[in-house]
Amino acid sequence: MLPSLALLLLTTWTARALEVPTDGNAGLLAEPQIAMFCGKLNMHMNVQNGKWEPDPSGTKTCIGSKEGILQYCQEVYPELQITNVVEANQPVTIQNWCKRSRKQCKTHPHFVIPYRCLVGEFVSDALLVPDKCKFLHQERMDVCETHLHWHTVAKETCSEKSTNLHDYGMLLPCGIDKFRGVEFVCCPLAEESDNIDSADAEEDDSDVWWGGADTDYADGSEDKVVEVAEEEEVADVEEEEADDDEDVEDGDEVEEEAEEPYEEATEKTTSIATTTTTTTESVEEVVREVCSEQAETGPCRSMISRWYFDVTEGKCAPFFYGGCGGNRNNFDTEEYCMAVCGSVMSQNLLKTSGEPVSQGPVKLPTTAASTPDAVDKYLETPGDENEHAHFQKAKERLEAKHRERMSQVMREWEEAERQAKNLPKADKKAVIQHFQEKVESLEQEAANERQQLVETHMARVEAMLNDRRRLALENYITALQAVPPRPRHVFNMLKKYVRAEQKDRQHTLKHFEHVRMVDPKKAAQIRSQVMTHLRVIYERMNQSLSLLYNVPAVAEEIQDEVDELLQKEQNYSDDVLANMISEPRISYGNDALMPSLTETKTTVELLPVNGEFSLDDLQPWHPFGVDSVPANTENEVEPVDARPAADRGLTTRPGSGLTNIKTEEISEVKMDAEFRHDSGYEVHHQKLVFFAEDVGSNKGAIIGLMVGGVVIATVIVITLVMLKKKQYTSIHHGVVEVDAAVTPEERHLSKMQQNGYENPTYKFFEQMQN
């Protein structure tokens, strides 16, 4: 009896030890997730190797319902007990998306917000609480809302406490992707600004992909071209902003009331994120901090050769920059890297050791080592609505300081030449060389300061555009979620959001045009990033517009006005793009006799021919008409079936497409070629992207097919005629060659046989044999 009981207990203990834990993620390398991008096959995370893989059946694309998403999770992870799904907090970059019925998958990435497949019993996320941050939570047992609702609650709660939302997670599930509470971590603004590179990496990308230590401007005339170009660009942007503000004055007063507290709450963060130095640190400390950072490739996957300062070796070393993100320890050349970091590190060693340290062969003064009175006053002033005026004053102060210093050097040079009249010839040459190097140093220093000024100004303008777009998107989504929604208010919010996106696109295009005029080589380096940025704007506008059609009543009432707004924006964008690329010109300094590019038949390509992007990626369209929207009784913004109407057997209203790029314009610049992301983009699902065939492209394809068909038919007819003619000519009726040695009788007999004569004797014997 006792041995049997012991054996039973041992068997039970062994079975429990081998039992799979209730937490299905235990022992898995990655969390079960799925990602969707309309027009492409769904992707799912391989929990064994941590890589994204396409749909195993090769047929499943984006799913419009939460029930369908849960079912799909259960299909791709049959060995796991999937009980619920929840939208992820942050977007991810996924490559190698596949299309239906195509074996080859494209390698360029898409940025999507995946869905997490929850395994077993629901367990809340373990949130990390940094120093000086607070952990909070809210639960309401009478409310059952989506992930987006609770994210908004957490963000507003942190804003009321003058803090930023650091991280959050859902609590108490009550349905598929619906919950009764949220847990979150709020951090002070200063703490968030210290971690801004990691928390808002995509937002920083917008300041990086055209910035950085781009070009060593040693020519003063070229610097002036850059400054004039940037002045005109920013002036145009500010004029458009003023016009847009007038256009939206007819909107609801709620919009203005919501905008004021947002600007007050984010003013401090914006100023911290966009300035290249701070008011509490000296210039040397900032440069020392920059040069002490590790080389960072960034999230993008380009292979750009750059240099960074290695503190351990005390010299600059090469590395590959991805094209976006990263940090400021990133220089174009080794000389520029040593000019910035070498002198500062040498001064640091001099302070710590008390012994003089050689500055090395580089004699160029740097922006960091220059007198900070001219530039720092602008850099230390937070950006505001008067940014352009502050930039003009800073530039004037910089030029005045440069002229004064150059005048002082010239006076010293003249005095030295007078004193060197009686010196040997070698000493005179040494004096001249000394002052020539000093003048070159001042010119290089002024060029670096101008470049720093322009980069800071561009970053601030970009930050203002980002903030306005983010605010417009949040107000637009809030208006859609109102109960009941007000169509006029929704349209005004949508109008402001579309204008914000268009200003961002125009700002990007104008900046690239100025760079192309001043430095074509630099333009060639950043053109793929510019194209990626434009594609992201198109996709984001498509997704945001698709949210409108989840509220059919509102969409139907304002459909005509939305179509008119989009058509107006399309015409304006086409004009801007046509003016930009119709006759590109390259600046050659003071040479005013250079022929135009149309005369020399020179073309400047915006993107490489063998790039990764196609024309289809740049053709956003109005997703579908109001009459094709499925009924949505609950006023919630959820993902829907985002396929084009033609693929779903539905009608689409004409003239409702978003801004497209004309095929005639595309033929002039080859546009078949990485992602800036901000917090305003995380509130909607990236999978809602729509594709449609371009009408102009279809016409060209039809004409090409017709011409090809005619050519093929002609070739077939000619071939048949020649074959038939060959058959007719194969029968030979020529003269039979006769031996010349035969007798005249035999020759006569041969002629008779040719005319049909038959020998009676032969004929007789043939009849007898038959």
UniProtKB/Swiss-Prot annotation:
Highest taxon above the source species: Eukaryota
Binding sites annotated in the UniProt record for Zn(2+) 1: 183, 186-187
Residues bearing the modification Phosphoserine: 198, 206, 441, 730
Motif range (OX-2): 344-365
Residues with the Phosphotyrosine modification: 497, 757
Site features described as Required for Cu(2+) reduction, chain residue numbers: 170
Region described as Collagen-binding: spans on this chain: 523-540
Extracellular side: 18-701
Tissue localization of expression: Isoform APP695 is the major isoform found in brain. The longer isoforms containing the BPTI domain are predominantly expressed in peripheral organs such as muscle and liver.
Record region (Interaction with PSEN1): 695-722
Bilayer-crossing regions: 702-722
Residues recorded as bearing Sulfotyrosine in the entry: 217, 336
Domain E2: 374-565
Free-text note on domains in this protein's UniProt record: The transmembrane helix undergoes a conformation change and unravels partially when bound to PSEN1, facilitating cleavage by PSEN1.
Miscellaneous note of the record: Chelation of metal ions, notably copper, iron and zinc, can induce histidine-bridging between amyloid-beta molecules resulting in amyloid-beta-metal aggregates. Extracellular zinc-binding increases binding of heparin to APP and inhibits collagen-binding.
Function description: Functions as a cell surface receptor and performs physiological functions on the surface of neurons relevant to neurite growth, neuronal adhesion and axonogenesis. Interaction between APP molecules on neighboring cells promotes synaptogenesis. Involved in cell mobility and transcription regulation through protein-protein interactions. Can promote transcription activation through binding to APBB1-KAT5 and inhibit Notch signaling through interaction with Numb. Couples to apoptosis-inducing pathways such as those mediated by G(o) and JIP. Inhibits G(o)-alpha ATPase activity.
Name under which the protein is recorded: Amyloid-beta precursor protein
